[in-house]
Curated annotation (Swiss-Prot):
Name of the protein in question: Photosystem I reaction center subunit VIII
Positions of transmembrane segments: 9-29
Encoding gene, per UniProt annotation: psaI
Function: May help in the organization of the PsaL subunit.
Originating species: Oltmannsiellopsis viridis
GO cellular component: chloroplast thylakoid membrane; photosystem I
Lineage: Eukaryota, Viridiplantae, Chlorophyta, Ulvophyceae, Oltmannsiellopsidales
Length: 36
C-alpha cells in the first residue's frame, strides 16, 4: 500500500531538495574560500 505513493514523494525530494542542499553547501564553501 505504501509503495504506491512513495515514488511521488521520493522523486521531488531527490530532484528538488537534494540539489538545493548541494547548491547551498557549495555556495557556503565558495563564500568561505573568498573570505579567507
Amino acid at each position: 500500500m505504501t509503495a504506491a505513493y512513495l515514488p511521488s514523494i521520493l522523486v521531488p525530494l531527490v530532484g528538488l531538495v537534494f540539489p538545493a542542499i548541494a547548491m547551498a553547501s557549495l555556495f557556503l564553501y565558495i563564500e568561505e574560500q573568498q573570505i579567507s
